[in-house]
């Protein structure tokens, strides 16, 4: 498989065409951004870490029957994935009060929820990726009610798998963001990535943060935090 011309470049990844009409080549970048791109920095090794962690987690999900776009890891920073039409919704699942939810509800960060909350955010940088209801989604016409139901069900299924998997590594899955795509056959599958960029991950005992909040809140060394997650997941750490 050959990497051809650049199709798209986002904050954290570059997407390239391949000679296969139904595959694209993903390259993870060393860039870190927060607050819708207002805070930016290049962090050497971050792309490798996100690629390695995403590979491990997508393989885990595939093992239990959850369909994803992941095909294979090509290098430390690259992977081959199925080409899909991305649904312009971020699906956020929350197990513990943190971040914007703490501010919105006036609840203390770290409060464990009795059951997960699933939220939808409309993917639009100009609008700041606003929180939307199912009624808003219908007005925006970005997903059908049936598709929204599938997204919710898949998010909750993935949540349970990841909660258990991270717990075995002594990590608490606080919340995380997923993106989904539609194949040419009309099937909804998991896309994008699952990494400390898209999850809040806390040590189960100390609540030490191993995610992008380290960068957002200037809490320490981002690379060391991501390396710790990779090490606990059984990957090869470069520390």
UniProtKB/Swiss-Prot annotation:
<comment type="similarity">
    <text>Belongs to the SAICAR synthetase family.</text>
</comment>
<dbReference type="GO" id="GO:0006189">
    <property type="term" value="P:'de novo' IMP biosynthetic process"/>
</dbReference>
<keyword id="KW-0067">ATP-binding</keyword>
<dbReference type="GO" id="GO:0009236">
    <property type="term" value="P:cobalamin biosynthetic process"/>
</dbReference>
<dbReference type="GO" id="GO:0005524">
    <property type="term" value="F:ATP binding"/>
</dbReference>
<dbReference type="Pfam" id="PF01259">
    <property type="entry name" value="SAICAR_synt"/>
</dbReference>
<protein>
    <recommendedName>
        <fullName>Phosphoribosylaminoimidazole-succinocarboxamide synthase</fullName>
        <ecNumber>6.3.2.6</ecNumber>
    </recommendedName>
</protein>
<dbReference type="InterPro" id="IPR050089">
    <property type="entry name" value="SAICAR_synthetase"/>
</dbReference>
<dbReference type="InterPro" id="IPR018236">
    <property type="entry name" value="SAICAR_synthetase_CS"/>
</dbReference>
<dbReference type="InterPro" id="IPR028923">
    <property type="entry name" value="SAICAR_synt/ADE2_N"/>
</dbReference>
<keyword id="KW-0658">Purine biosynthesis</keyword>
<keyword id="KW-0547">Nucleotide-binding</keyword>
<dbReference type="InterPro" id="IPR001636">
    <property type="entry name" value="SAICAR_synth"/>
</dbReference>
<comment type="pathway">
    <text>Purine metabolism; IMP biosynthesis via de novo pathway; 5-amino-1-(5-phospho-D-ribosyl)imidazole-4-carboxamide from 5-amino-1-(5-phospho-D-ribosyl)imidazole-4-carboxylate: step 1/2.</text>
</comment>
<dbReference type="GO" id="GO:0004639">
    <property type="term" value="F:phosphoribosylaminoimidazolesuccinocarboxamide synthase activity"/>
</dbReference>
<dbReference type="InterPro" id="IPR033934">
    <property type="entry name" value="SAICAR_synt_PurC"/>
</dbReference>
<keyword id="KW-0436">Ligase</keyword>
């Amino acid at each position: 498989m050959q990497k051809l011309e650049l199709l798209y470049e986002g904050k954290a990844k570059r997407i390239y065409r391949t000679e296969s009409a139904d595959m694209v080549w993903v390259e993870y970048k060393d860039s870190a951004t927060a607050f819708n791109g207002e805070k930016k920095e290049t962090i050497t090794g971050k792309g490798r870490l996100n690629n390695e962690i995403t590979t491990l987690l997508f393989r885990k999900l595939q093992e239990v029957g959850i369909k994803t776009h992941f095909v294979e890891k090509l290098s430390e920073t690259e992977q081959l994935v199925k080409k899909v039409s991305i649904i312009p919704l971020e699906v956020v699942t929350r197990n513990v009060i943190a971040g914007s939810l703490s501010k919105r509800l006036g609840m203390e960060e770290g409060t464990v929820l009795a059951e997960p909350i699933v939220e939808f955010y409309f993917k639009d940088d100009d609008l700041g990726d606003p929180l939307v209801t199912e009624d808003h989604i219908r007005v925006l016409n970005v997903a059908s009610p049936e598709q929204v139901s599938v997204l919710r069900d898949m998010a909750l299924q993935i949540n349970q798998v990841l909660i258990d998997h991270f717990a075995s590594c002594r990590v608490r899955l606080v919340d995380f963001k997923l993106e989904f795509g539609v194949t040419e056959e009309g099937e909804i599958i998991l896309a994008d990535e699952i990494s400390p960029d898209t999850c809040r991950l806390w040590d189960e005992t100390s609540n030490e943060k191993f995610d992008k909040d380290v960068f957002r809140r200037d809490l320490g060394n981002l690379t060391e935090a991501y390396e710790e997650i990779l090490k606990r997941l059984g990957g090869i750490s470069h520390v």
